Regions:
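Dual-mode signal for accessory low-complexity, basic/Gly-rich regions
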Residues: 93-275
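Amphipathic alpha-helical
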Residues: 79-99
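Generic, low-specificity signal for short hydrophobic/alpha-helical stretches with a mild N-terminal bias
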Residues: 20, 24, 41, 52, ...
Length: 275
């Protein structure tokens, strides 16, 4: 990746819309469209917020929101050690007790060029390692330490066995069809405060953040009050996954705890029923 613009727009009431634009080839028109889109959302944020009653809704997650969910997979889901200890959020998938949608595929993809394909011990990883292919579990991330401990074959994973350069494959949902596909429901641009509420069961909790809206009859109506969700990945990546978007966004790692983070992800948006 050659550039990254990580920005937020605020109005006088401190309502905010957060966006990120990164890639290898700068496209002035695409960046301009993203700014225009963010400005329109900020205008909507000035409207009175709607309190959404507790329930289940058709929900669109923008790529940034999907990226937050994906980040949780590095905390006790894709780890080979967690699997062997019976703690993995994907354990039910590994055991055949739960299924994911054939529309969902996840890879550790160093071909993105977001970080080097070797870990802190200099061990080389495959350039593209399938984790989940069309809903089927293919690989856990297995470090050399875990491989030695459990007599497994390592695949160059880092010692903490988290995703470093993941990508979720896109689907068939066109950008212009997103609101129509929601009908009446939720449009969630960003999430935060995610955590496992039941790690072994694959349930996570979190809260909405920037630019989240109520949608009626295929139109953005107004922003929503912050809300908390608690849902199983076996539902939103499984039976309730309607589709993923045709477009994807790249999110370079921007963390700077102790040192500048490397890596990142490439993900689409997704639309889910009964969330």
């Amino acid at each position: 990746i050659n550039f990254l613009v990580d920005f937020s727009l605020y109005d006088k009431n401190q309502n905010a819309v957060k966006e990120q634009y990164g890639g290898s080839d700068w496209n002035r028109e695409a960046f301009s469209q993203q700014i225009t889109h963010a400005k329109r959302q900020l205008e909507l944020m000035a409207k009175p917020k709607i309190k959404v009653p507790r329930g289940h809704y058709t929900t669109y997650f923008g790529p940034a929101a999907v990226n937050e969910i994906l980040g949780m997979m590095s905390w006790g889901a894709v780890s080979g050690s967690s699997w062997k200890k019976g703690e993995s959020a994907l354990g039910l998938l590994a055991d055949g007790a739960k299924k994911l949608s054939p529309k969902f595929s996840l890879q550790e993809n160093f071909e993105l060029g977001l970080c080097p394909p070797f870990n802190e011990r200099g061990e080389i990883s495959k350039e593209n390692l399938p984790i989940i292919s069309r809903g089927n579990l293919e690989n856990f991330l297995i470090s050399s330490k875990t491989a030695q401990e459990y007599d497994l074959e390592d695949n160059g994973a880092s010692q903490y066995e988290g995703l470093r350069s993941p990508s979720i494959l896109p689907g068939n949902l066109k950008e212009e069809d997103i609101l129509k596909s929601i009908g009446t429901g939720l449009y969630l641009s960003n999430l935060h405060y995610l955590n496992w509420s039941d790690q072994r069961g694959g349930r996570m909790t979190g809260m909405t953040r920037f630019a989240c809206f109520w949608v009626e009859n295929g139109e953005l109506v107004a922003p929503i009050e912050d809300l908390r969700f608690d849902e199983s990945l076996y539902k939103f990546f499984g039976e309730n996954l309607i589709d993923l978007t045709q477009f994807t966004e790249t999110f370079p790692e921007t963390g700077s705890y102790q040192n500048k983070g490397i890596g990142g992800s490439k993900v689409p948006g997704m639309i889910v029923q009964d969330f």
